[in-house]
Amino acid sequence: MGKALLFSRGTIEMPNNIRLSAIRNVIAIFLLLTLCATAIGAGEYKPVFENSADFPLMGDWEGKWIDPHAGHEKHNPELAAQLVCLTQKQYLVRILPKLNVRSVPYLEVKANVKDNMIVIDQAGWKCTFANGTCKGTGRLHGKDVGIELKKVERLSPTLGQKPPKGAAVLFDGTSFDAWQHNDGRKVTWSLLKSGTMQTVSLFWDNKQNQKKGLGGDIVTKEKFDSLKFHMEFRYAVEPGKRGQGRGNSGLFFHGIGEVQILNCYGTPGYWNECGAFYKHEPPKRNAAAPPLQWQTYDVEIQLPDKNDKKTKALVTVYLNGHRIHYKFPMSYTGNDGVSIGLQDHINALQYRNIWVVSHPSK
């Protein structure tokens, strides 16, 4: 049993050794809390938009089976992989028959990265991803078969497309003149020296921006009839984030609906993921590119006649050159055209080269 506390005149007195120990503990706790607060402030989460060399394994890989002995692969030995950054030290490795199609992976495993290298030795697969190549063996129809893959960068065919004559340029990298916040405020997003805009969040987790009145969705000042629209965007590397918590934004055609923007690289492409009419219709394929890579949305909208309240708008969407919706019918609730919006949804997104060609509805 420890020493008893001494009571005197209704107060508690402690022996000197206990008193000094208690004081030391209080000081230690105070210093710990101070250091934690400092660390939290200094280590505030920042998305990674640059330094792709820090993620040399992330992205698309293409190659083939070497002399497959049976099955479809004997006639078409095509092979592909997606390496998805989960954390600074762990990746999701998906080995597939082909990129941008919904297919059952040959292999889908989590693997650690060390010295810019991933070594797979799981489920009968033995291969190494390093320096832009992957060689080894995979399990195919009960046998070990050689594989070889190379890192590839597949860019959208419409990347950098210039606005045609007569187009309304919504963003050329110099100003936000064509935009405003939904509540009419001047745009408070960031205009970067690179000629891109970057979201500034007014979301629930950013109290400072809320106090300063910064951030929030933006929308075009002008409305448009039937249109052809082009935009380029990219999301950051956000290690540790998952699902709707990474690369989340949205492309809105007000009066019709939202085309989702989301870092869903390496996912099936559900109805709430990139390319979907959000929680309405999934894309025909997941054509989302890996983080850091510039991507394109090309959208065509045919609005019904202004006096026609029954016919729906027809929407065609291309993501990175892949047609993911074709003349999909969407209810149109407007009567004087559509404004175009970009969503603030916590995450940092970048946009550039935004333009639209509008023509009267038939």
Region spans (language model):
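Bacterial N-terminal signal peptides that target proteins for export
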Residues: 5, 15-29
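A ubiquitous, low-specificity "background" feature that marks scattered single residues
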Residues: 9, 22-23, 31, 50, ...
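Bacterial N-terminal signal peptides
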Residues: 26-38
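A glycine-anchored, Pro-Gly-centered beta-turn/N-cap motif
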Residues: 57-60
